[in-house]
Amino acid sequence: MAQSVPPGDIQTQPGTKIVFNAPYDDKHTYHIKVINSSARRIGYGIKTINMKRLGVDPPCGVLDPKEAVLLAVSCDAFAFGQEDTNNDRITVEWTNTPDGAAKQFRREWFQGDGMVRRKNLPIEYNP
């Protein structure tokens, strides 16, 4: 059963953080790549700390071994310097899909007793 095996590694490009550059009076979009470097199919979901400022498309999906997906991370216009951005980040969560499951994302994969891994990508705002 897939759930008894810990999920393998993923890679992200960029690997450690996302950087948005001023001006912030218009929406910015930054692309990141998520690569399933494990030998099993995984389901992934993306969470953001600040949902009114940050969005991710697609927010979830399924990746076969060695498959990659390009995600659009968008930052809506905001008043830079007047809002707290210190804790802004996106979090990639992933788990193995059950054996024989269709290649269609299901939220319940993350709600059972299977292991879920996380990778945080802090967001940096350049003035």
Swiss-Prot record:
Tissue specificity comment: Sperm.
Functional summary from the UniProt entry: Central component in molecular interactions underlying sperm crawling. Forms an extensive filament system that extends from sperm villipoda, along the leading edge of the pseudopod.
N-acetylalanine modification, residue list: 2
Additional remark text: Around 30 MSP isoforms may exist in C.elegans.
Cited PANTHER family: MAJOR SPERM PROTEIN (PTHR22920), MSP DOMAIN-CONTAINING PROTEIN-RELATED (PTHR22920:SF7)
Main localization category: other
PROSITE patterns: MSP
Classification lineage: Eukaryota, Metazoa, Ecdysozoa, Nematoda, Chromadorea
Name this protein carries in UniProt: Major sperm protein 49
